[in-house]
């Protein structure tokens, strides 16, 4: 299992674009396999990743994830290919549906037929990226374009998927899934079997599974878990997340996080690996500044051990 860094928490703490790029550069220098950034409000994740290209040399850079409702797939393809060229073909384009509350509350777009939405979105996006041409007419998304020229290789595409229909789409048509707050039991018993079956039926390689949860090496686990529970309480009310947490047998986000001693966090990482996770994207959740160094040291050792 490869170990990467999820830098998305920097956005919610008000980090500048320069600080986020610096964070990715350090992850590259320290030997982590990948660096992931969510598309929230600002900054634009793909633009930030394009800037990371000049400060990094080998690390894989990915979006985790770009919500699809606000961007036409042809426009996203153009932006992804531009970013891919800028960073030397190291991009993974992670996309996802987001949630009814954010799509309807912020974008004022009806969150209707989400699985069909993603199916049609991929029907435009994938040929645009791979074939550089698309001709598709759907009920939600359509595209007609030829001659998309770019020297960049097609980036890998992954879909945030936890339920059966989305896992089938991810397995059949993309490189895998990107997960948040999904634990080892849910991955082993629910996510990986459905994803692998769909990929095999479509004649595709075994898919990647990128899992991300809060991580902290600390002597005060109850304090950190309490903060995780408070800050991430909203996920308890989102059906897709509630479903995977129920499958995990946990009460909430704090229970699936890796928070505790070095031995406890290492055991948690091993559980993710044994469940079939191919990539673990650690979101370093630091409450006490004294926990930052031991958390990063453990993750760095795990990342470079193999």
Language-model-detected regions and their locations in the chain:
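Active-site-adjacent structural elements that line small-molecule/cofactor binding pockets in enzymes
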Residues: 1-306
